[in-house]
Every structure is written in C-alpha cells, then in structure tokens.
Amino acid sequence: MKKYLALALIAPLLISCSTTKKGDTYNEAWVKDTNGFDILMGQFAHNIENIWGFKEVVIAGPKDYVKYTDQYQTRSHINFDDGTITIETIAGTEPAAHLRRAIIKTLLMGDDPSSVDLYSDVDDITISKEPFLYGQVVDNTGQPIRWEGRASNFADYLLKNRLQSRSNGLRIIYSVTINMVPNHLDKRAHKYLGMVRQASRKYGVDESLILAIMQTESSFNPYAVSRSDALGLMQVVQHTAGKDVFRSQGKSGTPSRSFLFDPASNIDTGTAYLAMLNNVYLGGIDNPTSRRYAVITAYNGGAGSVLRVFSNDKIQAANIINTMTPGDVYQTLTTRHPSAESRRYLYKVNTAQKSYRRR
C-alpha cells in the first residue's frame, strides 16, 4: 500500500516493459488494477520529463533498474542487457557530491528488491556486505568491488576521469557511465543456479528452459518490473500466473509483491507455472518438442492464444498440432501468432535455451 500511495502522491513511478500478461484469465479486478497502474506510469513519465527534460525520461523495466533520489534529481540506471551502469544528476549545487554518493550506493547495494522502493525518491538503498553487483563490475585497477573504501576510491576516479555533461536545454546533466564485465550475464545467472536446480527437480522442468525464460524475461534482474505489473526474475503477474499456481497448490488469494520479489519464490512460482502449461493447459500435445514450443509461447501470451492459432476449439487445436512436425509447429507459432511479441519471444527463448543446453 505504501508504494501505491507514493505513486499517487508523486504522480508516479517507474516501470516499463512488455504489456503481455501471463495466462488467459482476465478478471475485472486485474484489468482495473492494471489500467490504473498504467495510468500512474504515464503520469510518472510525464513528471520525469518535466524535471529532466524532453527525451530524458528513464523508467524501470524488466531489464532496467532505475532508482531516483534527491527529489528525483539524481538517478542510477543499470541496463542489464547492455551491461552499463549510468549515474546521472541535474542537481544545481555540488553535482559531483550527488554523483559520488549514488555511485557508491549503487555499487554496494544488496540483492533484496523488496527493501528498495522504486516508487519514490527515498534514499533507501543500504550498503551490503554482499553487493548484488559484486563480480559484475571491476574498478580502475581491475578488482571487484565489495567494500565501501574501494567503492569510494573508484567513485573518485570516475569523477576525475570519466565525468560527462550535456544540456537538456534547461539544465546541465552530469553523468558517469560504468561498463560491466563482459560476462556479467553469466555472473548473474550463476547466483540463481541452486534455486533453478531445486525448482527443476521439484516440477520436472528442464533447467535450460528455466534459465532461458529468466534471461529473456529479465536478464537475471531481480528488481524487474513491467507496465503489466509482472514482477521479478521470471516476470510473474500476481493476479494471473501467480493466482493459478497458488490455486494449484491449495492456497487462496494471490502471491504478494514481496513474495514475488524474493528470487527463490519467484523462480519456484514461474517454474510451477511452466509445469502447469506443460502438463495441464497444453498437455494434449503429444510431441515433447512441439509442446515445448507451445509452452514457451504460452508463457508470454497465454495457452489459449497459442491453441487459437490452430483452431478455436482447444481439443481440435491439439489434434491439429499432433499431425504436424515440431518444425512446422515452430514455423506456425513464429509467423501466425497474432502477437508480434509472442512470435519473437519463442525465437528468443528457444535460442537462449540452446546456449544453456551446450554448457
């Protein structure tokens, strides 16, 4: 509630990404919540534009961590796809001091998304003894950054040697960009391998598929959010996939935001939903490869939309798929699915899964 109040008061916050919802169960409450949430995101983007200037709007998404502080005048942006960390400020006084503080806190922040309120400018980032970015960033001497002393020295080096500035027409924007190590994606993935293996054994879902979904959904960003209010590493939506999984486990209601921001809980829930798609919603598809293509596409756009590509009758759709080769099923889903995002999604996840199978 506190986060939504902050959203409403400051006209509010960040989040941007896929608008696709996991699952096909569209209920009125979910639609109202999502529409209201989307309106607040639009208002927040407008407010950031007023503060930072035209074409300077940066908001959090599945693969982008964005945290504003200093009355929204300083921001930290981690692009987990590109592997860059950009710290910027439009503070009119002592901009270097604002940047230095933000650099240190970003480098040393922990990996508990529920402790950071992305919906306000509150400086609630705590320095951790186990920084989330440890090993994903090295300082100017090539050393990983764990302690405040090393982070402070690196911040001083960056401000002296890499400080940039540009004008947005009204203000000067000061910035520092840090490149992550080349294998930053693998470094993040490694953090969650134990959780992935546990979920894989529990639900009978291939580890490579879980990892491929995580890479495609969030680039292993535990802070991942979206305009459809999908949360965490596997971008689970509380009121659809989350509710389906809870119901299958004999639980009432929906998983909380803090539950889905917990990496282990998120991976467990996302994997449970993959198992439901495979064993229940799409269980009538006989060929395991064809069924895997259908499951991947359904994780993005829903099982119903997958089956309707082949027939409006679900049983007939499965029968039609069972007469096709896996290659033809893949070709059909990547060319005839009504959602361009879902068509691309199957290609991305399938490609990523191949890379994890080779390891």
UniProtKB/Swiss-Prot annotation:
One of its GO terms (cellular component) is cell outer membrane. Belongs to the transglycosylase Slt family. Keywords: Cell outer membrane, Cell wall biogenesis/degradation, Lipoprotein, Lyase, Membrane, Palmitate, Signal. A lipid is attached at residue 17 (S-diacylglycerol cysteine). A lipid is attached at residue 17 (N-palmitoyl cysteine). It comes from the Bacteria. GO terms for molecular function: hydrolase activity, acting on glycosyl bonds; peptidoglycan lytic transglycosylase activity. Residues 1-16 form the signal peptide. It is an enzyme of class 4 (lyase). This is Membrane-bound lytic murein transglycosylase C. Murein-degrading enzyme. May play a role in recycling of muropeptides during cell elongation and/or cell division. It catalyses: Exolytic cleavage of the (1->4)-beta-glycosidic linkage between N-acetylmuramic acid (MurNAc) and N-acetylglucosamine (GlcNAc) residues in peptidoglycan, from either the reducing or the non-reducing ends of the peptidoglycan chains, with concomitant formation of a 1,6-anhydrobond in the MurNAc residue. One of its GO terms (biological process) is peptidoglycan metabolic process. The keyword Signal applies. Its main location: membrane. It is found in: Cell outer membrane. Its EC number is 4.2.2.n1. It is a lipid-anchor. HAMAP family: MltC. It holds the Pfam family SLT.
